Amino acid sequence: MLLLWLRNALPSMYNRQLARGALLIALALALQGLRLVVPLPLPVSTFLIGTLVHMMLTLTLQLNGRSTALLLGALLPVTAYLQGQLAVPLLLPVVWLGNTVFVLALATLLNKKWLYLLLPPLVKAVLMLAGAWLVLELLALEQLNVRRMLLFAMSVPQLVTGIAGIALAKALLRRLRNV
């Protein structure tokens, strides 16, 4: 009811936010798809795309709000799976939950001096590591190398790219505000 009233009362503002949200989501999905177009070694691709994705989650949160950022956080693992970057389908909810916690922690800590830079990526990395471990236990995956690779991918890169993505978004927002 309130949403309808707002939509009728403030149509240009509502439309502007809807359009901006759609553009931010489209840009994030396009950046995530770079790995399909630009052939990069896996480690470079992981850290570059991961940083850009975390930057877009942060920018979307700050420019369009929590709802749009949470929607983006849900779409990203689905597109990663469709692109072949998420090998185990049971990891989809793990990545979605990690993105959700990242966005919510970032929204909560945005005005805290250094906590916003470190805590959301750390919480996401720990949560995704625990979630991936649970999934691998459920699957009873025996191959030690595959287990190690998946557990690493769900932890350390999330922490590093999360911090880098937040820092990049902050620098970009500073530049945008000066324009």
What role is predicted for each listed range?
Residues M1-V179:
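Loop-helix junctions at membrane interfaces
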